[in-house]
Design a protein with these regions (language model features):
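Hydrophobic core of alpha-helical transmembrane segments in multi-pass integral membrane proteins
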Residues: 31-44, 62-68
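N-terminal membrane topogenic signal
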Residues: 16-34
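Loop-to-helix transition at the N-terminal end of transmembrane alpha-helices
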Residues: 51-66, 85-90
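A membrane-cytosol interface segment of integral membrane proteins
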Residues: 278-317
């Protein structure tokens, strides 16, 4: 039963709305769709001199900075407000993501996988794909990547060897703009695996797919209260959905696995509409960076010793 171990809110009708005047309510109702369509239009019509990955990187930084500002203007929960201690910890992981993890992805991760696949397949085999309208290409790339992430994430909650590195991410006790980067490097590497790099031969479509990911998936880990339109809540993963996934209630964590497209959860029966304020594990115990780095290995070693130690202790028949 969801909510048996920790308080959660289930059902959109029970979730608080944005309070304030009509201007504030308008902004926090239509901000998400506006940013989605505005950035899509920008990258769709931008000249080739601007349609580059380097420009996209700076656009992403700017978008995250804007959301960081909104966290101070209209926080979802005061208990999630960013502190200096949380900020310093988060920036350590953000730096890790843009350095070591990016290098790992290039040499042994999704980028390497994409190059290996391209080595065995001729690009002319995909002329049917390149002939599709640009937005359709982008939507398909976006869906394929998120579909893979859904099953990787669900597998992490179902198989203990994968759960060990992922469990570190579930020790976070609040959501904010940088929390998506917090976790054990092994888990962050695995969750980033996909075939997105396989579509590098379609740079504009890949950029548009990245915009779709940026303007829908980023909201998983932010401390902002939105009055998201009903169609948005049906299609995309919201902070509400992901807070429920991060709650201290075990049954609630077995829901809402999709990174951006919550309707994938709806298809497979793992979607729960709701939210939670109390996040984390072990009653909200906060992990140090050192423990986050070593936890999967120390716990894995304990599990192995317990399993094989018990087997060797059994008397011979």
């Amino acid at each position: 039963v969801i909510g048996a171990q920790s308080p959660v809110t289930v059902g959109w009708e029970n979730i608080p709305k944005v309070q304030g005047g009509p201007v504030k309510q308008f902004i926090f109702t239509w901000f998400q769709p506006t940013m989605l369509f505005a950035l899509l239009a920008f990258w769709y019509y931008a000249p080739n001199s601007l349609a580059k990955a380097s420009i996209a990187l700076w656009v992403g930084f700017g978008f995250n900075a804007l959301l960081l500002g909104l966290e101070w203007v209209n926080p979802r929960y005061a208990s999630w407000r960013l502190t200096w201690k949380e900020l310093v910890t988060d920036l350590f992981y953000v730096g890790l993501a843009y350095t070591l993890l990016r290098m790992a992805s290039y040499y042994i991760g999704s980028d390497a996988m994409a190059k290996a696949i391209e080595h065995y397949f001729q690009q002319d085999k995909f002329t049917w794909f390149t002939g599709l309208p640009l937005l359709v290409q982008a939507l398909l790339i976006f869906f394929i990547f998120d579909f893979g992430q859904y099953w990787m994430h669900r597998g992490m909650h179902s198989w203990y060897p994968l759960w060990l590195p992922h469990s570190v991410h579930h020790y976070i006790t609040q959501l904010n703009i940088n929390k998506g980067a917090v976790g054990n490097p092994v888990e962050l590497f695995l969750i980033g695996l996909g075939i997105g790099g396989f579509f590098d031969f379609l740079p504009r479509a890949a950029l548009l797919a990245g915009v779709l990911k940026l303007t829908t998936g980023t909201y998983q880990h932010i401390n902002v209260r939105f009055n998201s339109p009903r169609w948005w809540r049906f299609l995309f993963t919201t902070t509400e959905h992901h807070s429920l996934h991060h709650s201290q209630d075990y049954e609630a964590t077995r829901s809402n696995y999709a990174g951006s497209l919550i309707f994938i959860d709806r298809i497979f029966g793992t979607c729960v509409d709701g939210e939670a304020e109390l996040l984390g594990m072990e009653g909200g115990r906060r992990m140090s960076i050192r423990e986050q780095m070593t936890y999967p290995f120390t716990e894995g070693w304990k599990a192995l010793k317990e399993r094989f130690g018990r087997s060797s202790a059994l008397p011979a028949q």
